[in-house]
């Protein structure tokens, strides 16, 4: 059951995503004009209790204002006391003509975040070519404590200042890839939560076993999603 008590209410329509599948691979088009998500403002942000340990940011919500500025303001407000995670989940068609401001916002939010998750494609868009682990360490130098890199059918990687862990993906027959990254994020966060690791202090002292558990639950969860 999803707890919705902190959700803002609006009579505006919901963002609509159109997905085109070719051999299980998805391309996206979004209708986001005058929607509830796009028009979220800072005065609608909830006050959060101490029981909320972690905030996740990502996706197309970080492209257009006022929502993009609102979510960045929420991160600025909450990052000193809570764990924050960001997955830019870049959709090139959605950011066309806005790449400069979008990149600047993503870079600011990455620098404030404790956890960053990127697909290998998003990593190269942000950081250029090169070795994935080295590029991840360059992101760590900006401020985060943990970087997850998903590498498609190969698997996923977790990089910290002293660790570089990799877990291979589960072999499945792919029906479509929609939601794979979101499911990985949920699985990885769930494993870190179950380990009691979603605090700033613990994220700086993760064991190899804890990283492997997060990668394993993330990749296995994503495997189920893409097989359906």
Language-model regions, residue ranges each:
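Acidic, amphipathic alpha-helical patches
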Residues: 45, 106, 174
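Conserved beta-alpha-beta core of the PfkB/ribokinase-like small-molecule kinase fold
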Residues: 54, 60-138, 144-145, 154-155
């Amino acid at each position: 059951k999803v707890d919705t008590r902190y959700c803002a209410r609006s009579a505006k329509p919901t963002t609509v995503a159109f997905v085109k599948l070719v051999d299980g691979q998805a391309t996206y088009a979004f209708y986001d004009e005058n929607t509830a998500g796009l028009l979220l403002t800072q005065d609608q942000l909830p006050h959060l209790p101490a029981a909320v340990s972690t905030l996740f940011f990502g996706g197309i919500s970080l492209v257009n204002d006022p929502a993009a500025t609102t979510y960045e303001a929420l991160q600025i407000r909450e990052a000193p006391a809570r764990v924050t995670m960001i997955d830019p989940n870049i959709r090139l068609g959605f950011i066309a003509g806005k790449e400069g401001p979008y990149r600047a916002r993503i870079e600011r939010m990455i620098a404030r975040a404790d956890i960053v998750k990127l697909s290998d494609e998003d990593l190269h868009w942000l950081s250029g070519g090169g070795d994935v682990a080295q590029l991840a360490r360059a992101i760590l130098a900006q401020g985060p404590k943990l970087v997850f890199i998903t590498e498609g059918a190969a698997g996923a990687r977790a990089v910290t200042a002293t660790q570089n862990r990799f877990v291979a993906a589960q072999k499945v027959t792919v029906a479509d890839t929609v939601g794979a990254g979101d499911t990985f994020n949920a699985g990885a966060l769930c494993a870190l939560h179950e380990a009691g690791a979603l605090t700033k202090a613990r994220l700086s002292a993760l064991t190899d076993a804890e990283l492997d558990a997060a990668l394993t639950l993330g990749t296995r969860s994503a495997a189920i999603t893409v097989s359906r």
